[in-house]
Amino acid sequence: SEGITKSVQYALDKLGITENDEAVLKRYIGPPLDESFAKFHGLSREDALKAVNYYRERYKDTGIYENRLFDGIKELLSSLKKEGYITALATCKPEIYVPTILKYFDIEQYFDIAVGSELEGGARRHKDDVINEVFNQIIKLNKADNADITNASDTTNVSDTADILNDIKADSIMVGDRKDD
């Protein structure tokens, strides 16, 4: 989260706003940045978009590397993969940064699916949209591996696909670090 909060500070500084309250800065973690700049610092739409550009200016080169993994997460992911579980990442970080982050932390080999948010204007900007895309990709992955799911998903019956999605959700474990996850 340090990469995010420092990049938010950088963006605000570029707009002449000083913010040192860590609690305020941490509120930016998760929701779309343009919405957060408007909500937490009262920026106009135009200034919020400028702030997002400033944020990314710093984040893409520096902030992306100022984060850390939770203790034991590599071992957990390795164990889950060895046990044959499908592992997926749903993050509100823009999808364009996801491969770099996974590679930097040397964990890309542990994920079957990794989905991030889309940039401004994209349909997938909130965490629930990202999670739904993960489930859609799990369905596709299962279709390739499981004839029963393939047969049910290939029908035009929406309730069959909904049943499959409910089964996948029931068998899923999600780990998050905030109430938004």
Locations of the language-model features?
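Helix-loop "lid/cap" segments that line or gate small-molecule binding pockets
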Residues: A11-L12, P32-R45, I101, V130, ...
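Active-site neighborhood of HAD-like aspartate-dependent phosphohydrolases
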Residues: S1-R27, H41
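Short beta-strand immediately N-terminal to the catalytic nucleophile in serine-hydrolase-like folds
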Residues: A90, V175-G176
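Short, acidic loop-to-helix structural element flanking the phosphoryl-transfer center
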Residues: D61-L89, E95-P99, D128
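Substrate-recognition "cap/lid" segment bordering the active-site pocket of phosphatases
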Residues: E95-N146, D160-I173, K179-D180
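Conserved donor sugar-nucleotide recognition element shared by glycan-biosynthetic enzymes
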Residues: I4, L33, L69, R124-K127
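A metal-dependent, Asp-based hydrolase signature
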Residues: R27-D61, D71-S79
